[in-house]
């Protein structure tokens, strides 16, 4: 996948920016506040219909403006051209148009433009709460597997219905028969999600090991899935996992009714990262944590390429901060074999297949 043109109108500090990126590595450099990250975020909107810096569309409005517009023109590895337009206004919300057609469901666009991000804030995937790691899993798998996205949407819908019913049962205003129906549905969707997550972790690990060995000293990474309901998910078939969910929900039924809340499931699960058998969150240095996350993000490149037969667009914000020159050179060499890559930095840097673009202040 390649971006041929991106236009940002009244988007953050860009009143009207039009930019035609080069192939290979695009290094956007300039002082803090010049709008480098905003260019990456605009591309991210075209790919995933949202930003990666902020969760609120309104925060992307230029100061004093009531709407923003993003236009992107993309060409796939199979030479298929796509035009993507994102418009947001305070009055009418967000609208997504692809090749002239308005999309009523943003989820149907996910995966069309595979995208990988890195930003310093994403260190929370390593050292933050479980919700950050679940978000990492879901964002990656949803782009590569539309069935997973549908399972997630179905799971969330049934979970909301089940929680609402548990509250009604707590107040004794509903029959328990409907709870059995929703529990059966939830168990099946939960098993689909857990199995897809396990498959993803298994498939990404070889790439993670290879890249980590290039950017760091020889260290052995491992990722363990930690279920909120199942002691060990690894030895179970999908049918066995469905049955286990059924049994756990049956055991916890009275407690769930008393609390008015579903006890556990994929929405409460976690993953644990290890280096040389030591949990990274507890024992690794900040540099080791950063190298691990960078390697894991870069491993997504091979994962998406294999799954989608499409090279993903890479958006790496402030990638090189806190890295010494030798590691920067290694990363440049690795990224030179990728497709189109965007990196932000405060200073001009050189490397193989690098095109530098100066983003002056207040464009």
Curated annotation (Swiss-Prot):
One of its GO terms (biological process) is DNA synthesis involved in DNA repair. SUPFAM superfamilies: P-loop containing nucleoside triphosphate hydrolases. Gene3D superfamilies: P-loop containing nucleotide triphosphate hydrolases, RecF/RecN/SMC, N-terminal domain. GO terms for cellular component: cytoplasm. One of its GO terms (molecular function) is ATP hydrolysis activity. ATP binds at residues 30-37. It comes from the Bacteria. It is found in: Cytoplasm. Its main location: cytoplasm. Belongs to the RecF family. The RecF protein is involved in DNA metabolism; it is required for DNA replication and normal SOS inducibility. RecF binds preferentially to single-stranded, linear DNA. It also seems to bind ATP. HAMAP family: RecF. This is DNA replication and repair protein RecF.
């Amino acid at each position: 996948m390649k971006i041929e043109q991106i236009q940002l109108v009244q988007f953050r500090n860009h009143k009207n920016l039009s930019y035609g990126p080069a192939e290979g590595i695009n290094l956007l450099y300039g002082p803090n506040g010049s709008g480098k990250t905003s260019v990456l975020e605009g591309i991210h909107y075209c790919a995933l219909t949202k930003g990666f810096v902020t969760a609120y569309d309104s925060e992307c409005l230029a100061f004093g403006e009531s709407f923003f517009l993003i236009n992107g023109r993309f060409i796939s590895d199979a030479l298929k051209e796509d035009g993507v337009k994102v418009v947001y206004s305070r009055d009418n919300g967000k609208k997504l148009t692809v090749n002239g057609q308005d999309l009523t469901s943003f989820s149907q666009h996910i995966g069309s433009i595979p995208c990988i991000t890195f930003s310093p804030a994403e260190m929370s995937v390593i050292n933050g709460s479980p919700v950050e790691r679940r978000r990492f899993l879901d964002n990656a798998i949803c782009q590569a597997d539309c069935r997973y996205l549908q399972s997630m949407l179905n799971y969330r819908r049934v979970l909301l219905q089940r929680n609402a019913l548990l509250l009604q049962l707590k107040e004794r205003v509903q029959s328990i028969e409907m709870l059995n129906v929703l529990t059966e549905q939830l168990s099946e969707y939960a098993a689909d999600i857990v199995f897809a997550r396990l498959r993803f972790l298994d498939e990404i690990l070889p790439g993670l090991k290879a890249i980590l060995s290039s950017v760091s000293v020889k260290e052995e990474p491992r990722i363990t899935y930690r279920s909120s309901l199942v002691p060990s998910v690894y030895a179970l078939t999908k049918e066995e996992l469905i049955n286990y969910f059924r049994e756990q929900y049956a055991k916890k039924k009275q407690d769930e009714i008393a609390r008015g809340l579903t006890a556990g499931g994929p929405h409460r699960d976690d993953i644990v990262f290890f280096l040389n058998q030591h949990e990274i969150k507890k024992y690794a240095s900040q540099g080791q944590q950063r190298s691990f996350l960078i390697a894991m993000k870069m491993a997504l490149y091979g994962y998406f390429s294999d799954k989608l037969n499409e090279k993903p667009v890479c958006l790496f914000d402030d990638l090189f901060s806190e890295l010494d020159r030798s590691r920067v050179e290694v990363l440049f060499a690795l990224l030179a074999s990728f497709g189109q890559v965007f990196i932000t930095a405060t200073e001009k840097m050189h490397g193989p297949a690098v095109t530098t673009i100066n983003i002056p202040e207040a464009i």
